[in-house]
């Protein structure tokens, strides 16, 4: 079984995991591809289900930022639904998946801890850029996929 996790944020990413083990980790940065390219990539991965982070507008964000965020969410939801032939796209709030994977910190430290947990669970995953900086969209997408894969296996 293959499960997809999507972080729809501005620096978002898509991750597909295979239930056969942590060796298969496919990652795609959303900010670097067109929606069509993202669909083609996801279609080739053949996910059985898709989990998208259920996020909403944030207080203090500008109207322009909120609009862009909503637009990204709509695009990835459509891509996901088409890639899994119209099946239901599942959602999970950050609070739920972060608790599930063992995040214990708050605020800006969350991104670092999520990456540390992801590296332990999936050491083959490339979560860092060419200069060594964390690509937090990848880490989030990976942990959303991890959450989804474990939920699917229990059903």
Specify the residue positions occupied by each region the protein language model found.
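Phosphate- and other anionic-substrate recognition elements at nucleic-acid/protein interfaces
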Residues: 1-155
